[in-house]
Amino acid sequence: MAYSYTEKKRIRKDFSKLPDVMDVPYLLAIQLDSYREFLQAGVSKDKLRDVGLHAAFKSVFPIISYSGNAALEYVGYRLGEPAFDVKECVLRGVTFAVPLRVKVRLIIFDKESSNKAIKDIKEQEVYMGEIPLMTENGTFIVNGTERVIVSQLHRSPGVFFDHDRGKTHSSGKLLYSARIIPYRGSWLDFEFDPKDAVFVRIDRRRKLPASVLLRALGYSTEEVLDIFYDTNVFHVTEQGLSLELVPQRLRGEIAVFDIKDASGKVIVEQGRRITARHINQLEKAGIKELDVPLEYVLGRTSAKVIVHPSTGEIIAECNSELTQDLLVKIAKAQVVRIETLYTNDIDCGPFISDTLKIDSTTNQLEALVEIYRMMRPGEPPTKDAAETLFNNLFFSAERYDLSAVGRMKFNRRIGREEIEGAGVLSREDIVDVLKTLVDIRNGKGIVDDIDHLGNRRVRCVGEMAENQFRVGLVRVERAVKERLSMAESEGLMPQDLINAKPVAAAVKEFFGSSQLSQFMDQNNPLSEITHKRRVSALGPGGLTRERAGFEVRDVHPTHYGRVCPIETPEGPNIGLINSLAAYARTNQYGFLESPYRVVKEGQVTDEIVFLSAIEEADHVIAQASATLDENGRLIDELVAVRHLNEFTVKAPEDVTLMDVSPRQVVSVAASLIPFLEHDDANRALMGSNMQRQAVPTLRADKPLVGTGMERNVARDSGVCVVARRGGVIDSVDASRIVVRVNNDEVETGEAGVDIYNLTKYTRSNQNTCINQRPLVSKGDQVARGDIMADGPSTDMGELALGQNMRVAFMPWNGFNFEDSICLSERVVQEDRFTTIHIQELTCVARDTKLGPEEITADIPNVGEAALNKLDEAGIVYVGAEVMAGDILVGKVTPKGETQLTPEEKLLRAIFGEKASDVKDTSLRVPTGTKGTVIDVQVFTRDGVERDSRALAIERMQLDEIRKDLNEEFRIVEGATFERLRAALVGAVCEGGAGLKKGTEIDDGILDGLERGQWFKLRMADDALNEQLEKAQAYLADRRQLLDDKFEDKKRKLQQGDDLAPGVLKIVKVYLAIKRRIQPGDKMAGRHGNKGVVSVIMPVEDMPYDANGTPVDIVLNPLGVPSRMNVGQILETHLGLAAKGLGEKINRMLEEQRKVAELRQFLGEVYNEIGGRQKEDLDSLSDSEILDLASNLRGGVPMATPVFDGARETEIKAMLKLADLPESGQMRLFDGRTGNQFERPTTVGYMYMLKLNHLVDDKMHARSTGSYSLVTQQPLGGKAQFGGQRFGEMEVWALEAYGAAYTLQEMLTVKSDDVNGRTKMYKNIVDGDHRMEAGMPESFNVLIKEIRSLGIDIELETE
């Protein structure tokens, strides 16, 4: 196998047994693909698909005026170029967006002509606002902050059948219902009531009998009965009544009379229940008609209107009950045929017939009026209004859209073959839904499971943006319609008609403040990736926390391979916010799909299919870990499979699919936990969530025990620098990498050079530090996709969230009580968990009513010492180390004129004006903060003079840009001249450049000429002359292009900044704060084992082993058994082996053993023990082997993939190879006494993370401060500089101790006794420590509240 640039420097030993059939797909695809579909940028007009912006425009245009004499048509759109690149947008606090220009055509028709002849056509491009662009990492920059749009999991449009689970009625009877959910438009519900009549609701309003809707659709009673029921036909003869017999319909009934065959033999005796055997006999006997007594017909319902044959008079209406009197009338009128509805109690209930009986309407108009009254109560109905309203509800494409998904789901559910159709409902659709509902009530068919992932779909960014865009367009449409009537008379152009504000506002609102547009979690690369792969059931059109029950939150069988069963937040959102599984993707309808290998007759193929939850149900799916022989055949007699969402076992030949990988069940974060299979699910959940809170450490350290997913996460997260094209490293320094691209990868017209500017010490959304470090050296060869620089929390292109620590599981003096953690001082000395946090502090100079604020170093009443870190512009130097209270930016604000005393006037006259009329409002370092200034940015509005600092910053930026462009030109020029040299050497020259005719050119001649002179050469070969001319033109073009680029950047830098109204200047100061680990910080492993650092001990006091190596960290063994996360113990053992092997390699290097020995030992490590994949060490040269061995000194990194990791025997073998005890335990000695502990202790290496819950951010103290307005009690919380609440239980505690005075002090002068506390403050200042308690303010509030209840309470003094 081929290793990438970073892989061969440090190969990870892989313990997996199963082959990788499919690589983990690109992890951000769900975001990028969705938004690409939405924009369709760069797609030619004829290839535009009907999605995204294009679909939104097509659905709203053409807009036709009310008179019909003018129309505005949509022709196409184009996206402009962004004004600033991503970094500039973040810096300036603007949105990364492109202008959208739409070409529209205004057509004016001739009023006079009959056939609408076109009078005038105008085409024009109209600006429709800005559309935010997605960065290449799947985020949006909105107002300078990086945001993520989270995908939403919502109920798919379509039709759903459900029941109330017996909760509505006291009898526990199941009431069935059907609901048609469109993508947009009114919901239509059908439901049964406890009396078994069917009702309809529109948009969850009051219910009407369902027959009202059918009548409004134009069905008569007879047609309705015809649709829903079969009929029994009775013939009236001289002898009485005879029934046209359909034997199947008698099944289950009790015979009211003897049923005989033609010969008179009794088949069913009276009073017996008719069974399937009886029906067979009846069918054999071939009885077509059956004489029945009169009582058999009594109580049945007529299916047709019964008319007097001679007079035409109606004897019985359709759907009326046949009574004794009616039958007499029928007999008298000599009616020969009666049709009744066939109903029974088993599978054909009289529900629709009963509903028709309670329906008061009789015709279509009455039904329409009834619906109008329900939808618009209180408005007088007219025929037209009622018809229009009803048609707009479900039959108008403008108001109602099922969408392609909805139609597909609808048709599939009601059993139609085709999956395409209209977006609006038809009469047949509504009737089919009712039929299905009645069938389900009759016991034929089952209800849907709304938590099945076949009934829930994912709405991604693109789709949500399209919906918002459409909302904006619809608002525009209303305005345009009104203006169109003026267009014909006033000769307006399209841009006069369209006001783009509503569109821009809708888009801005969605990206800026939608519930699903979230501030990106940027703690570390994993938290970024997880945030982009999150799927939320909350948000507009989704669920709310309060209403979501247990079922929605629960793990469903269809989650397998689509949504992670582990990773979800703890707390109120549990189960509502999920993470995509590692291999999941969405299909064209938005349903989640998972990949499977195809299995044919027990033979597993390499063909991979992606199936949604619906498609997968009928398949028999084997686990990825099913045993196969070497030809890929299933060999077990019974294979564990999933079928119909159940786990079961089947024979190999029944299996149709097989999982792709064991990790396809879990999400990215969960797949980073080694030995996940040995952890309890609750702890695994905490482990996945806490990895996202790990703060990037100063020096990232790869995990010794990983899972092999680390590289994928680091690469896909976008924090590393990945080579766009292969080539040779031309130059590299800390802030940029220049690559000379391989010739075969350079396309014509492109420069053969790639320049990568690295991000240095930048602030992330969570105030952590983003910094990139180059991994390559000058002259290295890199291929496309290689990692050239590490970002935060990555080490050689692998995710590295924490540090490998030597741990011992043992109690230690009670310092590790309740999950506390005991650390060694060495960890602090080596800066293992030191993190850098960057804070942005902003100083804004505004234009006030009294005059402009000024940023200056001339601040009144401030000593020289306070100003020694500021430059002449009043702004702090970069590199200054500042403490709390230091001035960062000097600023003065004019203050209002006050009446001056004569003395002040005199002083002013003597010492001049300035000092008094301004006050100091400088930006100072906040309390509890100390750090180093690492960057300053100055933004000045247009028209305001820029200060010296702003100009200096601008000069520096221009130098950087110029340096990049020069470098690019140097390499392009070099490559061009190399090509020319190859062509010219050996050719004959005709003269020019001071050479004689007939000179043969060699390297010496060319080296003697200046490069500009080369183009003056006249060659004998015309082709060479042409090549020289082309090269000269090409270089001139390149130079011009780069100069234009420079001028463009310069223009951008020199133009004023777009600041908020009233703001003259903004100065941003960035402070880097170094935080060492200290007691009170929260740490965790990857298995949900979290704790707080309780004590940092001197190295000499820590337990040490027989070699004298002390442990770094002591954990409590009691934290393991009850929590059932045994994975951490296995990780510790394997970590010990990894470290031991590293030490062994280190000894070999120090003893300067031969490379062959090293190679052999590495072969043992990588290829002898466990794992299927053999590492191809022979492909590495000796120098590469030495390089690899040197990188392995700290430990051989291992990968134990989830559900396919190292076995116990393999861990033991690894320990043995490292010459360590196979038990993983060793005797330790007490550092303080030197005595041996009485039992062996588990010691090893565990990967520990420092979480973003730092004691520095939480520690807080208050003496006096702000008070709440009403109660006069101190505010709460660090942000408000609040106090500690002395609550109910604390009061009880003091009462229990009888500490009356302390209690009084707590409730009065220390809280809300206003006079008492001011008096006490004065007393303390005077050195008098007495206190007098008065009346607490909250008591007055209480009295006021009692008075508001109408009870007058007064306090009277005795």
Curated annotation (Swiss-Prot):
Gene Ontology molecular functions:
DNA binding; DNA-directed RNA polymerase activity; ribonucleoside binding
Recorded hits in Pfam families, A to Z, give: RNA_pol_Rpb2_1, RNA_pol_Rpb2_2, RNA_pol_Rpb2_3, RNA_pol_Rpb2_45, RNA_pol_Rpb2_6, RNA_pol_Rpb2_7
Q: What is its EC number?
A: 2.7.7.6
Q: Does the keyword ATP-binding apply?
A: no
A GO BP entry is:
DNA-templated transcription
Q: Which reaction does it catalyse?
A: RNA(n) + a ribonucleoside 5'-triphosphate = RNA(n+1) + diphosphate
Swiss-Prot/TrEMBL keywords:
DNA-directed RNA polymerase, Nucleotidyltransferase, Transcription, Transferase
What is this protein for, i.e. what is its function?
A: DNA-dependent RNA polymerase catalyzes the transcription of DNA into RNA using the four ribonucleoside triphosphates as substrates.
- Assembly: The RNAP catalytic core consists of 2 alpha, 1 beta, 1 beta' and 1 omega subunit. When a sigma factor is associated with the core the holoenzyme is formed, which can initiate transcription.
The entry sums up its family as follows: Belongs to the RNA polymerase beta chain family.
**Name assigned to this protein:** DNA-directed RNA polymerase subunit beta
Instruction: Recall the taxonomic lineage recorded for the source organism.
Output: Bacteria, Pseudomonadati, Pseudomonadota, Gammaproteobacteria, Pseudomonadales
Q: Report the gene name.
A: rpoB
